[in-house]
Each structure stands twice: as structure tokens, then as C-alpha cells.
Amino acid sequence: MVPIYTRGGDVLVGPVYVAGASDMPCLGCLEYQLTNFDSHAGLAVSRAAAGARIGASHGLDIREARDLLVDVVFRSGGDRSGGRAVVGTLSGECVGVGNLTISPLCRLGGHVATCVGVEGPRAAGGDADLLVPGLRGGRFASAQSRRDMIAMSCDSLFGPVVGPRRFESISPGVLSGSVVPPVKNAGWGRKRTSLDADFVGVLEALERMSSLPYHDDAVVRQIDGDERCLGPADLGGYHEDQYTHSSSRISADAPEEWVAGWGMDGARVWVPAEIGFYSYFPEYGIADMASVFDAERTPLRRYEESSSGSATGATYGEACTHALLEVVERHAFMSFWYSSVLLPRIPSEVLSGFAREVEQWISNRGHEVSLLLLSSPYPIISVACVSFNARGEYPAVILSAASGLGFDAVCETALWEMTNMVGGERTLSESEARARLISKWDVMEAEDHIAFWALPERAPFIRAKCRGSLLSEGEVEKLRGRRGAGSRLDALSALSYLISEFPSHDLGAPVFVDQTNVTIGALGVSCVKCIVPGALGVSFGFAHQRVAELRVLERLGRSDLLASTDDLLPHPFP
């Protein structure tokens, strides 16, 4: 429900968020609440529905409420594509306009206190215990708590999540998506029950909504020379031909902008803005929809970053933990990709019953599966799943990956991730892929990475990387026995435990950027982006693969990639 608040003769349209101990009215700052009605459900229907719901809930005349929305909101003269919120009067007079972003945050002067910001170091140690190997606390352990979270997050008209979108079951279990205008689907949930699939999909949608800074002040142009920051030597840089190629969407001349992250020691570490918030475009600031709708946008970014390392959690520490696991998963996969060392394969006979069921489902659709045990810091287990089309047809190869502390759960997740790609629709047909991807430089988006390696003639290259020896049953049992399911760790201990072996893998101490915005905070969850110095990154586009200056490539026997792009290939997208 969207309340109407009156302040003298002024009217505010928007939800209530909690700021500290008091309830503060604000405009919500979800762009689609007001400016995307027409793109979501049809303008006429949405206006009437909004008026009816507001009038019914606040005792206002329905016509009066509808006129307020039509005359004040939709005729305010604001630029819809950039997002506008309105302060008006019941007579329809517009007395103030404020920007909206999908962050979201309150952009009207009197309500900035509702913004959720990080004013100092965030300590994970105060969080509730996390269960190992799942590394989740108890807040959402019950089915009712998950139902309540879905109910709080979803509203068919005003969001923040419009609602779950159930997909026809194309594999064992249930697949749900979460609809967030203006995109068709912003979060995927794949679980064994509808409730759990909806819940995971909603959490992922909230995670994606946190990909922009929560207020302008979060981004700074200058930092003190004595302060810690991460640059190309920590994150990877580009070769000159990557900067200059026509397929590049980055620029060495882009402004250097920074956001604050926090190390395990509580110290502030500055991170490039496009790394800390992967949807951030410097030329548009926090007006994210403006960048989406501007087809002529200029490439003023220094990084073309994926969402790797972003996670939501019931607490800040829980979010940090799962963000870290995703970085390790992607780094382990990329290490496998760049290295020429063969990794051990996991035999089907040792898999759990559910994993074998999923594997059989994939096999029934004409694909052969190889599960590889990736090299990752103890105690984390990372697995890659490689699916080969038995007929040698397009898509000839599909890849996925997963990581965690439980061997069976990690294998199940890696296989499960594969099912949607094996059974779902192709983003690009084979003819479209061939016409679009003439050379490696033509790989520019996530679907290009996938399609490039799905072409049949490239299958032998990947098959050659999947010929390692099979793990023995004894080796698998050691992996299963690393930690008992009943063990408990507080979040700080869990993070310390997970990173204890990082130095031996040429990985630095993680840095955490708190992406929690006002909506996420009001729902009582946190969103975090984790950055690990030295980790191999997953990027969108061959020209944006950051390999220069990453010394981990020397350990992998790929010093040639530090010198030039001659032997560099587009990475698959796990």
C-alpha cells in the first residue's frame, strides 16, 4: 500500500521507512513506483488501481486520490526516464520535484535521514551464529519467516519486488523469478519447494537493487594519499589494445571515483566506484535508469564489472560471508580456465541421490556432464560443472560453478545451475552467434561469453581441460568430513576461518562494501559487495578482462597473459 501524508497543504506520496527509532515519511525513491506504471501494467489501469488502493486505505475520495496521482505525479513535467518523485497539493499543484533512483533513497530535503549509510567500520562479530556448512543464521530457518519476508518485499503495484514469477519446471525442483520493472526478471530462485524458490528469487532481486550507491555522498573524487585504496595492481588492469579497441566500453580517461569499503581489521579501504557498485556509471551518478534508457551513453567507466561478490544476508556478517564465497567460486573457476593443469573429476557414483537425479535429467536431454574439483582455499569447496552436447550440436558446451563448505550441496548446486541452460531457451541461436562473434574481440556481453564457447568447433579445447583423474571414494569422504553440520561459528570467526588459507593462493585480505540501501535496511536484511585483491575477475566483454598486473597468473603458469592479449581468450561465464 502507498500512503498519502499531508504536511500543511502539501501531500507526499510514498511508503513509510524506519529511520532509527522513529517512523519517517518519504517518497520511497523506487523509480518504478511512480514513473514506470505505464511500462508495467498499462497507464490507465495503473492510475485507477493506484487511486482505488490509496483511497480505500486512507479514507480519501477515490477520485480525489486518482486526480492527485494523475495531475501531480504524471503531469509534473519531470523527466520520467531519469525518475521523479513529486510533492504536490490536493488541488493538483506541483510544489516540488525530487529525483528517484532504484537504489532507493529519499531525495527530498526533509527526509534524508532515512538513507542508510556506513559511517564507520562494520564489525561482523556481533552477528548471530552461523550454521556450518550452510553459513546461514536462524532468522529465516522457519517456513513462516520466509513467507513473511516475501510478503514484506512484494507488492504487485508498488514493489520493491512486484512479485514472484513461476517458471514451468524444466528440471527437478522449482524455478522462480522475481519481477522488478523495468526488467522482466531480476532474481532467480531454484529450490525444491515453491516457497524456497520464491524466497531465494526475492533475495536475489533485492541484491540486484543494491547495485548503486545509496546517496551522492557515498562517491568521492579525491582521497587522502595516506589512505588505503585498491587499484590495478590489486584488481587487475588492461593491456593497451584493450583500451583502444572499438569494442571497449571503458576509458583510461574516465574520472577516478571511489566508495568506501572496510577490511577485516575495521580499517577503511577505498574501492573504485564501478567495482563497489557494479551498475554505477560516473556520467549519470545515481540516476541509474537514465543510463539504461540512454542509447547514446558514453563509455566513461574504468571497469566493466559483473555482479560477482554481491550477496544478501539476514545480517551484515552473513551477507559478507556469502559475498566472499562467490568471489572464491569465480576465482577458482577462472584459475581452472587459465591454467593448463588438469583438475580431478568427481565420479557420479559418489554423488548424493538428488545430484544423481539432476545429472540424469541433464543426460536425458543429450548432454554429458563432467564435475571438476576446483582449487580453492581450504576449507572452501569449489566445483565446476561442464556439460557437453553428446550430438556435438550447438550449444556444444555449457559451464557452471558453485562453492561452499558442504561437498554434496556444492555439487548439487553446480548441477542445478546447469539445468536452466540445458533446458531453457537460447539467448542467441547458432546463426546469430556466428554472425555476431567473428573474433574474440566481438565478445561484449554475458551472453556472448556463453555463445562463444557453445559453438561446436570450440568443444575440443574445453574437453581437453576435463581429462583429469577421478577422485577416489576415500578422497571424497575427506571432503565430506571437513566440518560437521551441527558446528556453529559467529560471522567474524567464519570469515577468519574462510580466509585463513588465502595467502597461499596469492589472495589478499577481503574488503567489504556495504550496499544496504533504505529499502533493504527497512526489510531488515543487508547487501554486501566483497572485493578480494588478487582474485581473477569475471567481466562483461573480452576487452574488459582484467589480467594485466595480476601476479596469480605466474603461479598458474600463464605469465604470457601479463605481457599481451595474444594468447588471451574470452572466458566462459559460469
Where in the sequence are the language-model features?
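E1/E1-like adenylate-forming module used to activate ubiquitin-like modifiers
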Residues: 1-68, 104-110
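A structural signal for alpha-helix termini and helix-coil/disorder junctions
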Residues: 32, 75-76, 330
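Oxidoreductase and adenylate-handling cofactor-binding alpha/beta cores
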Residues: 66-79
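Helix-biased "structured C-terminal domain" signature
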Residues: 81-574
